[in-house]
């Protein structure tokens, strides 16, 4: 009965979309291309709460009719916006500059803050730096020397922040898995680090959870470090990072997988 009802619903209210080709989305692509300048900012010096960055960057939104405007660059927003720029060689300088800004923040603060605002340096955002590095490395066919330097920044972030070597037991808290955190030890601010600000997902107790997404991102980091080691012909690094990734995968499957429900869930440790 349910199956028949579902079939009737889809036949009545749902149409399978046609496959689009380049001509169908030409107008949308042109709009996006012309919109990038509205999102681009240049601020090389610290001004009030805004932290200066060495290169132009993108802000997450712009609306000319709104009195509010963004002037800061956000960590994971930047990664996803750059996905829309990688296919056009004309964007290479801006894309490379945005990634270099993240490296600059790691050099200055030992981490990538939520955004380049002084009141947002108490926490980060979901770690996407290795994905960013490899997207740029592959898109622009960069050399191994560049990759080695870029990966070194990601490793510094990995160890300082997510593995809690700089501030022990703040992020990495249970059986090798990590949580979102804020130096003010406040649940809502830790939730902001998740990028889900704000959400019912953690029941306003974000500090108590080992999140699926965060630990998956860190598994990607460890896998990417292994891949970089292979490219750089560092066999010792390959072995080390393969073991690290396998260890995290085992912990994720052990703690975050719910066999009865057939899915992964955040774990209240």
Model-predicted segments: where are they?
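Acidic, mature catalytic/reactive cores of soluble proteins
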Residues: 1-269
């Amino acid at each position: 009965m349910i199956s028949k009802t579902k079939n009737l619903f889809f036949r009545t209210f749902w149409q399978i979309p046609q496959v689009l080709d380049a001509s169908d989305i030409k107008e949308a692509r042109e709009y996006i291309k012309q919109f990038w300048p509205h999102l681009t900012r240049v601020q090389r010096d610290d001004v009030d709460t805004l932290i200066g960055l060495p290169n132009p960057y993108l802000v997450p939104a712009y609306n000319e009719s709104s009195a509010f405007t963004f002037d800061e660059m956000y960590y994971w927003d930047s990664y996803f916006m750059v996905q829309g720029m990688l296919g056009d060689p004309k964007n290479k300088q801006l894309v490379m500059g945005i990634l270099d800004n993240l490296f600059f923040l790691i050099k200055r603060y030992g981490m990538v803050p939520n955004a380049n605002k002084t009141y947002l340096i108490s926490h980060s955002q979901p770690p996407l730096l290795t994905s960013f590095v490899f997207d740029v490395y592959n898109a622009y066919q960069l050399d191994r020397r560049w990759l080695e330097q870029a990966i070194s920044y990601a490793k510094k972030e990995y160890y300082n922040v997510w593995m809690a070597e700089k501030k022990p037991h703040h992020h990495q808290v249970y059986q090798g898995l990590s949580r979102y955190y804020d130096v003010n030890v406040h649940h809502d601010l830790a939730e902001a680090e998740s990028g889900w600000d704000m959400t019912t997902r953690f029941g306003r107790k974000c500090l108590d959870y080992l999140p699926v997404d965060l630990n998956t991102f860190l598994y990607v980091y460890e896998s990417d470090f292994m891949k970089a080691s292979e490219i750089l012909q560092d066999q010792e690094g390959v072995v080390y990072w393969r073991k690290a990734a396998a260890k995290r995968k085992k912990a994720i499957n052990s703690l975050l997988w719910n066999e009865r429900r057939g899915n992964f869930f955040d774990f209240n440790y």
